[in-house]
């Protein structure tokens, strides 16, 4: 796939900007806070309908405007695709494919695939479990767009179940009050059983897919990790689901959920929140039989994240049948020359790559000669 053009209107600090991509590699050079990351964020939004920086659409719209717009033309093996995303300060966003507004955002996902690698990703190893769950979920959405719906269903069930648990806890705290209806409490506990089965059903879909994708990603990451580390380090990736299960069979996984929910029922009612489910999953990275989160050096952690990103690229290509875009956001400065060369050699001309940087010193002459170089200043992009 090849991204031909991107047009931004009232997006972040861009009032009106069109970018034509004329090479397999594009380097965007400029000082900090000029809009480099915003351009890559726009491409990321077209790929995943999510930003890894903010959660509200209003934060993506230029200050003073009511709507922002991202338009793009993409060349796929099957032909051209025109992508559009309208973001609103208030109200729902609109997704447009080939000039037709789509009723379901799900139908937009999977048209453009991209792997984002920013300096924020270097926190993937030492960061919170939530950051690792978000990482694997973003990859899954690109490999299997229906997963976005599956994940959304799970979190809707979780929200409703938490609200009911909170209500039950409040009723139990007020149980000394003679005016409180024990019948109401009994009804709520009966209703909780219905949410238990919903949680087990939707949660099992999430956990089974996470396990499957990590099973496919791990050997690719291990191969890249061995190459980058000079085969001096051995990488293991362990999926640690909150609900343990052994066989990838829907009913058995659901049963494992229900059994754990039953075991934790009293604790959940006392806490007023759900403690069972994939929202509490963990993914552990181990280097030479030692958890990288606690003991990995900064260099080891960067090698690990670089291996993960290269594995993502190749897994998406394997599943989708076309190489995805690679978005490198100010990350080269964070890597030493050896890791920079490993990354640049791995990319070659196989993946269309957009790279942001504050200076061109990191690039070899041959790379600069084969790249389109753009400069950016105050939300204005020009040829370098």
Swiss-Prot record:
Give a yes or no for keyword ATP-binding in this entry: yes
State the name under which the record lists this protein: DNA replication and repair protein RecF
Q: What is its main location?
A: cytoplasm
Does the keyword Cytoplasm feature in the UniProt annotation? yes
User: What HAMAP family does the annotation carry?
Assistant: RecF
Q: Which GO terms describe its molecular function?
A: ATP binding; single-stranded DNA binding
Family per similarity comment: Belongs to the RecF family.
Where found?
A: Cytoplasm
Q: What does this protein do?
A: The RecF protein is involved in DNA metabolism; it is required for DNA replication and normal SOS inducibility. RecF binds preferentially to single-stranded, linear DNA. It also seems to bind ATP.
Per UniProt, which keywords does this protein have? ATP-binding, Cytoplasm, DNA damage, DNA repair, DNA replication, DNA-binding, Nucleotide-binding, SOS response
Specify the species. Answer: Gloeothece citriformis (strain PCC 7424) (Cyanothece sp. (strain PCC 7424))
Q: Which Pfam families match?
A: SMC_N
User: What PANTHER family is this protein classified in?
Assistant: DNA REPLICATION AND REPAIR PROTEIN RECF
* Residues that bind ATP: 30-37
